[in-house]
A protein has these predicted regions:
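Short, glycine-/aromatic-enriched active-site segment of Class I SAM-dependent methyltransferases
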Residues: 198-213
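Short alpha-helix
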Residues: 213-240
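Rossmann-like AdoMet
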Residues: 1-91, 95-138, 151-152
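Short amphipathic alpha-helix with an adjacent loop that forms part of the alpha/beta core around
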Residues: 143-152
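Conserved catalytic loop of SAM-dependent methyltransferase domains
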Residues: 232-258
Length: 280
């Protein structure tokens, strides 16, 4: 039986990123594979005709490459942390229907997937929690979820495409709260400069009738700007298109490599890594 998704629902906002990850898997098979996305979409009853039509456009194909690189980069950081903290908590902040935690499973870590209650309700149906895994309904801005994470073996948190929708003050409060609660832990997430965030936010800000884009989280020089928030933070960043992969794959055109360089350098598209006291 297929799970029906209606237009203009919260569920729809979760399906479209899944479709992007499936598109990545088809377009760039040497760079990225998300079998979960492919499998889940087979279980869903939804009209993908518009998404399929758009998938042929140049910018949609580049957007799929962006999604692929972002997911790969975050997974690389999670696996890197698990090398020195094999029993750590692996925490997906704003998980949607993303399965990165399970993809990074080393057989010993504890996996937590956090999102709003309506999102987790859908996730429980399509991606029920496995062994050593919990799906936790919460509001990320409310620190009550901190107590649900067993960080006795360390903790690595990651957020994909999440903080663009937070005010700068909200990100700062969350980061400082996490530094208190999870010393020795690491948070990794994608970010971009003000110009890029304005482009990302154009559609949803108009819908939400929000005028002050400048209050939303954006960063150009992460070590300097975020490092000033709290002396306990150890902040580094790498370009998210080319910082982890040179993209010299036959599936990626020279023009897309040019756009990737422009994204990393001009838009400051980056993966930010924050260590909370202790060693990174």
């Amino acid at each position: 039986m297929k799970y029906k998704i209606e237009k203009n629902t919260v569920q729809e906002t979760l399906i479209l990123p899944l479709y992007s990850r499936k598109l990545c898997t088809e377009l760039y098979p040497n760079l990225y594979r998300d079998e979960t996305a492919v499998h889940l979409l087979d279980q869903i009853d939804y009209d993908f005709s518009e998404a399929e039509k758009n998938s042929r456009s140049l910018m949609q194909r580049f957007g799929a490459l962006e999604v692929a690189m972002r997911q790969n980069d975050l997974a690389w950081e999670v696996r890197n942390y698990l090398k020195t903290h094999p029993c750590a908590a692996v925490v997906n902040l704003g998980c949607g229907l993303d399965n990165t935690g399970r993809a990074c499973d080393n057989g010993r870590c504890k996996i937590y997937n956090l999102d709003f209650p309506d999102v987790i309700a859908l996730r429980q149906q399509l991606l029920p929690a496995g062994e050593r895994e919990q799906n936790i309904p919460c509001d990320l801005k409310d620190p009550a979820w901190f107590d649900k994470i067993d960080a006795s073996g360390g903790a690595v948190f990651f957020a994909s495409g999440v903080f663009y929708y937070f005010l700068t003050q909200q990100v700062k409060a969350l980061v400082q709260g996490m530094a208190d609660a999870f010393p020795g832990g690491v948070l990794v997430f994608d970010a971009a400069n003000r110009t890029a965030v304005k482009m990302i936010a154009k559609t949803w800000l108009r819908t939400a009738k929000i005028k002050d884009v400048g209050a939303y989280f954006a960063v150009s020089d992460a070590p300097k700007e975020i490092g000033e928030w709290d002396s306990r933070l150890q902040v580094t960043s790498r370009g998210y298109m080319l910082g982890y992969n040179d993209l010299k794959d036959p599936s990626v055109s020279g023009f897309f490599r040019f756009l990737a360089k422009a994204g990393d350098n001009g838009m400051k598209m980056q993966i930010v890594k924050i260590g909370f006291g202790g060693k990174l």
